[in-house]
UniProtKB/Swiss-Prot annotation:
GO terms for biological process: flavonoid biosynthetic process; polyketide biosynthetic process. Belongs to the thiolase-like superfamily. Chalcone/stilbene synthases family. It comes from Gerbera hybrida. This is Chalcone synthase 3. One of its GO terms (molecular function) is naringenin-chalcone synthase activity. Keywords: Acyltransferase, Flavonoid biosynthesis, Transferase. Pathway: Secondary metabolite biosynthesis; flavonoid biosynthesis. PROSITE patterns: CHALCONE_SYNTH.
Length: 403
């Protein structure tokens, strides 16, 4: 007599579909355009290419902004030659969206490919093992999107599961990690390629006396792309885990509406910033820390490593002062701000890369400057704050980290 097959319930299937361990960052890659702009030279360059040299007082203000920015250099895709061919981008409010779009829909995925290729090489497995792609950029809304274009450029499997995030802003480096954590932990064997690619061509424009907040953006923003590969239950015969993600949260700060916003118009992406942004972040950051670290019984903010989005020097300074952080706590964040400027969502991933490389170079025992626990903060429009709790891992030397 034939026996009936065993009935498998939904709960059994559900458990089989999920990973056992936490989401882990397995590789990091970064890329920038070739065109390097030094901050000391930028005021002269900016006012020349925008034909604004007659605005002597405004140029002096911009010079002071650049001097106080703590930025040494930035990378930008747009060059003087490109701006000569597209003069509408140099006017303050001239219709120019078509020229901007034509550039970024092509160049954003291309720059993302450079970073992703480096991450895949470090990771060690063939790209065919990538199961999910999360792509994030502030610019170039298009259909099919940059996620599709990157899938084609990299030669990923057509069945890769894609998620495209447009126009989130500076907090989104934390958002992509939060999403990748959920994907990796809820899909056994998943390997998530996360790419943030940012090009400032959508926000570049000439100066205007009545819009100093726009001028602040011209002094801070740079171009860059970063990629990470995230998965649970690493295969230690090939993969070299860097950081484990313990928890991730997002919140909107109270009384912060309109503090940072951006609007896509015929003139490109306009940017608005209120002066009290650093104070709003500093006022609310300890609450986010307490919520994130109370399960770990940690309340000494100098005992953890720090990866904070460097929106500008004032944000870092006020957070440092408010929490009584030692100067070295925000070293990695300040280093990336100095060498690359504010690259929006890509910044925190650049800082992750800087931290693990410097930890190895300095002979630290872990990827988190020798410490066990750390925090990654993203700040941006809303004001929105992303908080990711990280657990560092033993520092090991790989070919990628020596480059």
């Amino acid at each position: 007599m034939a026996t009936s097959p065993a009935v498998i319930d939904v709960e059994t299937i559900r458990k089989a579909q999920r990973a056992e361990g936490p989401a882990t960052i397995l590789a990091i890659g970064t890329a920038t355009p070739a065109n390097c702009v030094y901050q000391a030279d930028y005021p002269d360059y900016y006012f020349r290419v925008t034909e604004s040299e007659h605005m002597v007082d405004l140029k002096e203000k911009f010079q002071r902004m650049c001097d106080k920015s703590m930025i040494r250099k930035r990378y930008m895709h747009i060059t003087e030659e490109f701006l000569k061919e597209n003069p509408s981008m140099c006017k303050f409010m001239a219709p120019s969206l078509d020229a901007r779009q034509d550039l970024v829909v092509v160049e954003v995925p291309k720059l993302g490919k450079e970073a992703a290729t480096k991450a895949i090489k470090e990771w060690g497995f063939p790209k065919s093992k990538i199961t999910h792609l999360v792509f994030c950029t502030t610019s170039g809304v298009d259909m099919p999107g940059a996620d599709y274009q990157l899938t084609k450029l990299l030669g990923l499997r057509p069945s890769v599961k894609r998620l495209m995030m447009y126009q989130q802003g500076c907090f989104a480096g934390g958002t992509v990690l939060r999403l990748a954590k959920d994907l990796a932990e809820n899909n056994k064997g998943a390997r998530v390629l996360v790419v943030c690619s940012e090009i400032t061509a959508v926000t570049f424009r000439g100066p205007n006396e009545g819009h100093l907040d726009s001028l602040v953006g011209q002094a801070l923003f740079g171009d860059g792309a970063a990629a990470v590969i995230i998965g649970s239950d690493p295969d230690l015969s090939v993969e070299r885990p860097l950081f484990e993600m313990v928890s991730a949260a997002q919140t909107i700060l109270p009384d912060s509406e309109g503090a940072i916003d951006g609007h896509l118009k015929e003139v490109g992406l306009t940017f608005h910033l209120l002066k009290d942004v650093p104070a709003l972040i500093a006022k609310n950051i300890e609450k986010a820390l307490i919520q994130a670290f109370s399960p770990l019984n940690i309340n000494d903010w100098n005992s953890i490593f720090w990866i904070a989005h460097p929106g500008g020097p004032a944000i870092l300074d006020q957070v440092e002062f408010k929490l009584g952080l030692r100067e070295e706590k925000l070293r990695a964040s300040r280093h990336v701000l100095s060498e690359y400027g504010n690259m929006s969502s890509a910044c925190v991933l650049f800082i992750l890369d800087e931290m693990r490389k410097k930890s190895i170079k300095d002979g630290k025992t872990t990827t988190g400057e020798g410490l066990e626990w750390g925090v990654l903060f993203g700040f941006g429009p809303g004001l929105t704050v992303e908080t990711v709790v990280l657990h560092s891992l033993p520092a090991t030397i790989s070919v990628a980290t020596q480059n």
